[in-house]
């Protein structure tokens, strides 16, 4: 009986430990965490890695699979990394809150991307991105989308589910028609959607 009781105590401690480990850090605590810039170093203690900033070689056009072992990761910066695609495994980073993918070569994001339900900030600026995943409405924590200098002409209808939480979509330097901007604002009446590039492109789309 004592052995059984001891067993369940150990199980309870383990479950509690995993639960605590899987919780998001408050912003102030997150800022105090080390920013890892070496994937090799990060993989030595993957459960202790909350912030990662990488520069990737040109021959690497997608996120290294090892990154998805960092399941406590909450901030990921992959600025100017020559990325052409985002791996479907991106959905494994369940605690990710801040994601910087600016200055890459991304045209679209996989549907698995919308499994990042804790994401608060998404920076996809300066990519030739033309669309967002259809199920963007699943990303209930999303507050800011920086899509400056992209080709994002339309938004998925499901994004209307974020009308109460999404604060800003930056579409400056996106060749929008006025009618396209109006359609976006109707989907998200409480969201600020700045844009600064008018395009008289009726013949193009």
Where do the model's predicted regions map?
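Hydrophobic anchor residues at the C-terminal helix/turn of individual leucine-rich repeat
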Residues: 43, 66-69, 89-92, 106, ...
């Amino acid at each position: 009986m004592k052995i059984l009781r001891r067993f369940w105590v150990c199980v309870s401690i383990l479950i509690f430990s995993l639960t605590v480990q899987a919780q998001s850090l408050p912003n102030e605590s997150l800022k105090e965490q080390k920013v890892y810039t070496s994937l090799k170093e990060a993989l030595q203690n993957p459960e202790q890695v909350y912030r990662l900033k990488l520069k990737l070689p040109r021959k690497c056009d997608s996120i290294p699979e090892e990154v998805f072992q960092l399941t406590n990761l909450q901030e990921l910066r992959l600025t100017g990394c020559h990325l052409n695609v985002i791996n479907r495994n991106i959905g494994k980073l369940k605690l990710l809150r801040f994601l910087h993918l600016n200055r890459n070569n991304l045209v679209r994001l996989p549907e698995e991307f919308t499994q990042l339900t804790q994401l608060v900030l998404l920076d996809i600026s300066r990519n030739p991105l033309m669309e967002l995943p259809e199920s963007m409405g699943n990303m209930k924590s999303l507050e800011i989308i920086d899509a400056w200098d992209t080709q994002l002409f339309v938004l998925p209808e499901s994004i209307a589910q974020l009308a109460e939480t999404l604060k800003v979509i930056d579409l400056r330097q996106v060749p929008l028609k006025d009618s396209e901007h109006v359609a976006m604002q109707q989907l998200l009446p409480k969201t600020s959607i700045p844009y600064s590039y008018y395009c008289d492109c009726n013949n193009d789309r």
